[in-house]
Amino acid sequence: MMLFRAVRHSDLNGVQSLSQRAGIGLTSFPNNLDQLRSRIARSVDTFDGKLARAQQGFLFVLEDTSANRVAGVSAIEVAVGLEEPFYNFRVQKTIRSSRELGIYKSIEALTLEQDQTGNSELCTLFLDPEYQKGRNGTFLSKARFLFIAAFRDIFSKTIFAEMRGVADEQGNSPFWNSLGQHFFGIPFSQADYLTGIGSKTFIAELMPLHPIYISLLSAEAQKVIGQVHEKTVPARAILEKEGLIYQGHIDIFDGGALLQAEIDRIRAVKESRLVSVSKAESVTRDDGVPCIVANQQFSEFRALLLNVVCDSNELFLTAAEMGALQVSDGDQVRLVSLFPKEN
């Protein structure tokens, strides 16, 4: 059984094992034991109500209960940029013209911005390559939306996801090589790692403050602006189908797309609903469709991916499923179809 749940301190070894396989470019998931321990502690403290809004962040794991193994992670930051600046580039068009020469040029430029300050963030999505099959990745990503829907008041009006940009296995980023390298003088992998472990002051100290004309970058760098790493293409598609869109904001290091949406307009949030559960000795799932089913408990939030009839007002679960969700007869659960309805 694949169970989506809040992270625990005891998950540290499993989470670290995953981080070793994540590779370069997943900034918020560094292979650093102390940082991962702190990240887990921050999530636990957030669930326990010990942190101010600016520090709050939820980390979840996807557990293979049959193997007692952490198969994936995903996270939500409540409000970014309230204590430390959160930077991104915005792609903007500027007009240059000469009446004397009869020349009119529309030129794109990159402007350093802090537009996402105060917004919530979807981040740290990584699934063990051994589990990258079936619907595990989609479940791991979208289960967060049911948590957001259940505890909507915690989060901001807008949410975004900064997608991993284009880089090769050695950590070479065309965008970084053409832009960031000139200002920082360090490899992309080092800048990415420093940001991941919380060393961010160098960004404000060294990043260019004036607009940068995109036409001055290399052809390779221009091609990857607003694009994502080949391994991130499925994750981008998942979010876009839920209503998040690219609006010209990109990652300052690798040029990866930043997707965003108003939370209340996200399909899985607005279509999710509450139903009552009943225990059944056995359940036939043949007439169902893949749905995410989650309990309504804050600190013990749990979700399963089950084939069920989504439009029914009653949901029958086996004893094992009820145990995994920690619900009893008559309790309410929140559910939503895994995929949008086809028009």
Swiss-Prot record:
<dbReference type="GO" id="GO:0019545">
    <property type="term" value="P:arginine catabolic process to succinate"/>
</dbReference>
<dbReference type="InterPro" id="IPR016181">
    <property type="entry name" value="Acyl_CoA_acyltransferase"/>
</dbReference>
<keyword id="KW-0808">Transferase</keyword>
<keyword id="KW-0012">Acyltransferase</keyword>
<comment type="similarity">
    <text>Belongs to the arginine N-succinyltransferase family.</text>
</comment>
<dbReference type="InterPro" id="IPR007041">
    <property type="entry name" value="Arg_succinylTrfase_AstA/AruG"/>
</dbReference>
<protein>
    <recommendedName>
        <fullName>Arginine N-succinyltransferase</fullName>
        <ecNumber>2.3.1.109</ecNumber>
    </recommendedName>
</protein>
<feature type="active site" description="Proton donor">
    <location>
        <position position="229"/>
    </location>
</feature>
<feature type="binding site">
    <location>
        <position position="125"/>
    </location>
    <ligand>
        <name>succinyl-CoA</name>
    </ligand>
</feature>
<dbReference type="GO" id="GO:0008791">
    <property type="term" value="F:arginine N-succinyltransferase activity"/>
</dbReference>
<dbReference type="Pfam" id="PF04958">
    <property type="entry name" value="AstA"/>
</dbReference>
<comment type="function">
    <text>Catalyzes the transfer of succinyl-CoA to arginine to produce N(2)-succinylarginine.</text>
</comment>
<dbReference type="InterPro" id="IPR017650">
    <property type="entry name" value="Arginine_N-succinylTrfase"/>
</dbReference>
<keyword id="KW-0056">Arginine metabolism</keyword>
<dbReference type="GO" id="GO:0019544">
    <property type="term" value="P:arginine catabolic process to glutamate"/>
</dbReference>
<comment type="pathway">
    <text>Amino-acid degradation; L-arginine degradation via AST pathway; L-glutamate and succinate from L-arginine: step 1/5.</text>
</comment>
